[in-house]
Amino acid sequence: TGMNGKIIQALKSMYSVVKARVRAGADLTEEFMCPQGLKQGEVCSPVLFSLFINELTKEINKQGRHGIQLSPEFIELFILLFADDIILFSDSVIGLQTQLNVLCETASRLGLVVNLDKSNIVVFRNGGFLGEREKWCFDGSDLKVVNMYKYLGILMSTRLTFSHTFKDLAERARRGVPAILKLLWTIGEFSPNVFFKLFDCQIQPILTYGSEIWGLSADQEVIERVHLCALKRFL
């Protein structure tokens, strides 16, 4: 890992005895032991988990990536990691099952537990039904194949369109408009400038979430309608 002995000894010392408490309002529970996992909120925890989970990437690389070659210039995409969320990509049924087998073996060896209730498969396609061979399992349990999955707030559909994402963002943003209007009414401030500033601070971040990905998509009318609806309600 490139870390010297002093750093490793310091980390061992930090995790030799880990205790925690739970805060509920102004109250604290009694201390209890935490024999597994990383310290919550500790600055080193994200780095330590990244080093830990990187073992999975190495194993998939070793046994064959079976990923997706987006273009000749790009490297083969086979995994996305964000905190403890893992996304596996493959362009074949056998390739994905191989990745799942590696994940199962690596998780067992590292003492990780995979939540199968939150583990789904999306087959990206132009249409039609799934083939008989398009089935996958993890440690002997069948995995559910779904038409849509939300990853980091973005809805991924089988056709790789963002129409469902637009509707989801618009609905979430629309629910926030009454709160802004109520605040303006409470403080007795009906200036358009104040309304626009509140909209830009509270609603616009919701509407533009993930726009780095879908910003060039043509069908964004549902997003703009939230802005027009908010203006009409304000007036």
Language-model regions, residue ranges each:
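Secondary-structure transition/capping motifs at alpha-helix termini
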Residues: T1-K6, K62-Q63, R109-V113
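Non-catalytic, peripheral interaction segments enriched in hydrophobic/basic residues
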Residues: A83-D84, K118-N120, F124-N126, K150-L235
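Short, well-ordered alpha-helical packing segments
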Residues: K12, T57, I87, Q97-S108, ...
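Conserved, non-catalytic sequence blocks in retroelement Pol enzymes and Pol-derived host proteins
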Residues: T1-K6, G37-V47, Q69-F74, S90-L96, ...
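Conserved pre-catalytic core of RNA-dependent polymerases
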Residues: T1-E55
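Catalytic palm active-site di-aspartate
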Residues: G37-G41, S45, S71-S92, L103, ...
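Active-site palm subdomain of RNA-directed nucleic acid polymerases
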Residues: L51-A83, I87, L96
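Short, conserved micro-motifs composed of acidic
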Residues: L11, S16, A26, V113-N147
